[in-house]
Amino acid sequence: MLPNTGKLAGCTLFITGASRGIGKAIALKAARDGANVVIAAKTAEAHPKLPGTIYTAASEIEAAGGKALPCIVDVRDENQISAAVEKAVDTFGGIDILVNNASAISLTNTLETPMKKVDLMMGINTRGTYLTSKICIPYLKKSKVAHILNLSPPLNLNPIWFKNHCAYTIAKYGMSMCALGMSEEYKGEIAVNALWPKTAIHTAAMDMLGGSGVDKQCRTPDIMADAAYAILSKPKDFTGNFVIDEELLKHEGIKDLDVYAVSPGHPLLPDFFLDESPEALASAMEEHGATAAFKAGKAQAKSQDSSPLQETFKAIESLVNEEAVKTTQGIYQFVLSGEESGNWFLDLKNGKGGVGSGEPSTKADVVMSMDSGDFIKMFTGKMKPTMAFMSGKLKIKGDMGLALKLEKILGQMNAKL
């Protein structure tokens, strides 16, 4: 890992969303230099599903050698940001570094994204980044080491990154456009850069998006913290860059990136928005055994009258039980196209559960549309739902929470198939 050099000693960092995940990891890295850290986040009380609060983060920062100022901040609220900035200046004498880390995500298509979610993503990602930067800039201009770092991707305009989650991409690219514009506007005064991971990072958000077992395909937030530290240690003339964590750390002399892996040696899940298309990424992962997290299905005896799809559903049916119903409580409908088109359902909500062709007797909680061939691959462990969704091969309507449970269900089924 990248060693601390002390370059951030005495610097004051204002980090949004720093109560957990990547934001907290960056805060702890800076704290080891003896930096002051303003934890600007919403979580003041423990969340039932998400770890950490601004106060637990503050304790960790101080234990690491830094000084912490926890502030309750919703980056959509101008008054809360202004109050936190003023408190930071009063406490530490100024602000040297702003890290715009707070973000919201919904990987849903246009018709399936309620305007409430659109407003949330635009408000936190784009507007929140712009607003927090605007309020901090007068103080940053007084610093000799002024930096703004946005955790956002390169501006890749390949339509593949828009078609499945247009609202999220627009909101995330808004953060990147802030970096692009402000780096030129404040050249010579404030360094402004963007940082994005090459691979998935294991955070609470990734657990929610990727489902059970996704952690093995991720790196820890430490890789982003080390990359951020490298950027923030550079002079002001390092500005206007869209940095990828892995590439920067290799340039900094880090040769063993496996130290950042949650499960060293396991194939990694590529992140969104990078040059390679999702389809190519999915193929590359399969070539390198990325589906090894789920055991390949054992050969099933096929009758001459049964199609591969029918055999797949027979295998699924043999594994449906009351325990699966109890833990899932959802009805899945599969709208399949291609060689074996038609509707099928998986009932993991009623009685002992059930599988069948056609539509379920009660309304499905989740409707999944895909090619029948890809469906067979997904249910026999040869394709992960996460990659199917990322590559556009799987369309989802309905309860996304239940959709995310499918990966865990498949893992359990594939272990027995």
UniProtKB/Swiss-Prot annotation:
Enumerate the SUPFAM superfamilies for this protein.
Answer: NAD(P)-binding Rossmann-fold domains, SCP-like
What Pfam families does this protein map onto? adh_short, SCP2
**What top-level branch of life does the organism fall under?**
Eukaryota
Keywords associated with the record: Mitochondrion, NADP, Oxidoreductase, Peroxisome
Q: Return the broad EC class.
A: oxidoreductase
Residues at the active site? 168 (proton acceptor)
One GO molecular function term? oxidoreductase activity
Taken from the UniProt record, the cysteine pairs bridged by disulfide bonds within this chain are none
Where does the SCP2 domain start and stop, copy by copy? 306-414
InterPro entries given in the database record = HSDL2, NAD(P)-bd_dom_sf, SCP2_sterol-bd_dom, SCP2_sterol-bd_dom_sf, SDR_fam
Q: Where is the signal peptide?
A: none
Main subcellular localisation: other
| Localization (cell) | Peroxisome; Mitochondrion
Query: Which EC number(s) does the record attach to this protein?
Result: 1.-.-.-
This protein's GO cellular component annotations are: mitochondrion; peroxisome
What NCBIfam families has UniProt attached to this entry? Answer: PRK08278.1
Which family, according to UniProt? Belongs to the short-chain dehydrogenases/reductases (SDR) family.
Role according to the record = Has apparently no steroid dehydrogenase activity. Might act as a metabolic regulator that affects systemic adaptation to nutritional cues.
**Can you say what this protein is called?**
Hydroxysteroid dehydrogenase-like protein 2
Write down the species. Answer: Xenopus tropicalis
